Amino acid sequence: MKFELDTTDGRARRGRLVFERGVVETPAFMPVGTYGTVKGMTPEEVQDTGAQIILGNTFHLWLRPGQEIMKLHGDLHDFMQWKGPILTDSGGFQVFSLGDIRKITEKGVHFRNPINGDAIFLDPEKSMEIQYDLGSDIVMIFDECTPYPADWDYAKRSMEMSLRWAQRSRDRFDSLGNKNALFGIIQGSVYEDLRDVSVKGLVDIGFDGYAVGGLAVGEPKEDMHRILEHVCPQLPQDKPRYLMGVGKPQDLVEGVRRGVDMFDCVMPTRNARNGHLFVSDGVVKIRNAKYKDDISPLDAECDCYTCRNYSRAYLYHLDRCNEILGARLNTIHNLRYYQRLMAGLRQAIEEGKLEHFVSEFYQRTGAAVPPITSDN
C-alpha cells in the first residue's frame, strides 16, 4: 500500500491509498461487512454506491466460517467476491464488547465463544495469523479497546499493554512475510498525556498507517474532538489516519476537519434496516405515518437507485410489510449518502473551500458548526 497526499485545507487532507487491488480516494468511508457481506448487498451493489474499500471482521470470520474454509476459497476476497481492497479489524473491539465473558491477561484474551460457549484464546500472534489467511490489504494490530469511562491509572495500564501487543503484532506480521499494510492503533482514553505516549511508542515501532482507537465508545463529542485535535498533528504526514468505528455524518465531517483520512461504521447499514435514512437536510424516519402518501423521492438530490426509482410512500409500504426489499433499498440509499458526503468533502478540500462546505452542511441540518479549539 502507498499513501499519496495531494493537498490540504486547514488540517483536512486530500489523498489516496494505492493498492494492487485498486485505488481508494481519501478521505474515505468504509462500509462494514462483518460476516463477509455488507448486509443485504451484493459486492457489485456496494461498489455502485461509490465504496472503494470495505471492512471485514476478523473475530467473527474466525469463529464462523473459520480459517480453513476461508483458505479453501483462497482468501476473503475470493470467498465474498469483493474485488477491491479490504481492511480487517483485529478482533480487539469485539473482545472488548464481550464484557463479563472475557478475561484479559498480558498474554492475550480468554473468552467464551458466543456461538457455542467453547473456551477460546486470542492473542496478537493469532490475530496476525487469521488476518494473513484472510488476505487483508490492511491488517490492524491486536489491542485492548479501553472502555469509557476509565480512570487514568486503568487507561495507562491498558495503553501500555496495547503498546506491548503492538510490538508483538508487528513481529508476527513480519515473520509471516506479509507484504500488505499493518496499522497501529492509538489508545489512552480521553487523557492527552497517555495518547502522547501511545503515539510515540507506535511511531517508534513503525507502521504503514495509524488508527485512533478508543473513541466513539460513549465519551462526549467534545472529548472526541479534543483528542483528535491533539493526536493528529503528532502523526507522520505521509501515513494515513483512521478513526475507528465512526460514525454519524457529522462525525465524519468533524473528523475530516481535524485531519482524519479513513472511517468505518455500521451506522448507515444498521440504521437503514431500522428505517432511519440520511438525506441532504437531515434524517427521514420512514416508519413515520406522514410518509404513507408521500410520492416524492427520498432525497431529490441523491442519484442512488432508490431515489431514482421509488417514492417515500413505497419505502414506507415496504417497511410496514417487513419486505426484505425495503431494507435493501434503504441500505443502498444510506451507503450512497455516505459516499456522496465523502466525495463532497474531497472536492471541497481540493478547491480550498472546506469550511464553506461545512457551514452549508450544518446550515441544512439546522445545527451549529462545532469549533476547532486546539492551537496545534
Curated annotation (Swiss-Prot):
* Alphabetical GO biological process terms: queuosine biosynthetic process; tRNA wobble guanine modification; tRNA-guanine transglycosylation
Reactions catalysed, as given in the entry? 7-aminomethyl-7-carbaguanine + guanosine(34) in tRNA = 7-aminomethyl-7-carbaguanosine(34) in tRNA + guanine
Q: Where is the active site?
A: 89, 264
Give the molecular function GO annotations: metal ion binding; tRNA-guanosine(34) queuine transglycosylase activity
Q: Which domain of life does this protein belong to? A: Bacteria
Q: Which biological pathway?
A: tRNA modification; tRNA-queuosine biosynthesis
GO CC terms? cytosol
Residues reported to bind substrate: 89-93, 143, 187, 214
Listed as disulfide-bonded, the cysteine pairs are: none
Q: What class of enzyme is it?
A: transferase
Q: Which family does it belong to?
A: Belongs to the queuine tRNA-ribosyltransferase family.
Name by which UniProt lists this protein:
Queuine tRNA-ribosyltransferase
Q: Which organism is it from?
A: Erwinia tasmaniensis (strain DSM 17950 / CFBP 7177 / CIP 109463 / NCPPB 4357 / Et1/99)
Q: What taxonomic ancestry is recorded?
A: Bacteria, Pseudomonadati, Pseudomonadota, Gammaproteobacteria, Enterobacterales
State the gene name recorded for this protein: tgt
